[in-house]
């Protein structure tokens, strides 16, 4: 459980500290999601419950779809603006 908490905090810190780079923000969101999935798997193994493992597979599938959609939006953003940097005004 400590590893999951450490990964979650790394993801939160990466998201907060890299506010200008969209790719690093997407990677940080994926780290957060996978740390929660890891926690669900650990809990599922501790309680000997197959439902948690099924739910973890579902989360990994959704995370893959989210990554594909996010990268598609990123490509469209790059084509529109010519840069992937986020500008705050």
UniProtKB/Swiss-Prot annotation:
Q: Which GO terms describe its biological process?
A: ATP synthesis coupled electron transport
Q: Name one GO molecular function term.
A: NADH dehydrogenase (ubiquinone) activity
Span-the-membrane segments of this chain are 1-21, 22-42, 55-75
What EC number(s) does the entry state? 7.1.1.2
Q: What class of enzyme is it?
A: translocase
* Assigned keywords, A-Z: Electron transport, Membrane, Mitochondrion, NAD, Respiratory chain, Translocase, Transmembrane, Transmembrane helix, Transport, Ubiquinone
Protein's cellular compartments: Mitochondrion membrane
Which is a Pfam family this sequence falls into?
A: Oxidored_q2
Q: Which InterPro entries match?
A: NADH_UbQ_OxRdtase_chain4L/K, NUOK/Mnh_C1-like
Name the Gene3D superfamilies on file: 1.10.287.3510
Gene Ontology CC annotation, any one = NADH dehydrogenase complex
- Catalytic activity reported: a ubiquinone + NADH + 5 H(+)(in) = a ubiquinol + NAD(+) + 4 H(+)(out)
Q: How does it sit in the membrane?
A: Multi-pass membrane protein
Biological role = Core subunit of the mitochondrial membrane respiratory chain NADH dehydrogenase (Complex I) that is believed to belong to the minimal assembly required for catalysis. Complex I functions in the transfer of electrons from NADH to the respiratory chain. The immediate electron acceptor for the enzyme is believed to be ubiquinone.
Q: Which family does it belong to?
A: Belongs to the complex I subunit 4L family.
The protein depicted here goes by the name NADH-ubiquinone oxidoreductase chain 4L
């Amino acid at each position: 459980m400590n590893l999951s908490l450490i990964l979650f905090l790394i993801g939160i810190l990466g998201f907060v500290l890299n506010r200008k780079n969209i790719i690093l923000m997407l990677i940080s969101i994926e780290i957060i999601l996978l740390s929660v999935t890891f926690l669900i798997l650990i809990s599922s193994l501790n309680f000997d419950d197959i439902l948690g493992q099924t739910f973890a597979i579902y989360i990994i599938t959704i995370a893959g779809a989210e990554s594909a959609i996010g990268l598609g939006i990123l490509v469209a953003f790059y084509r529109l603006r010519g840069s992937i940097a986020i500008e705050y005004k």
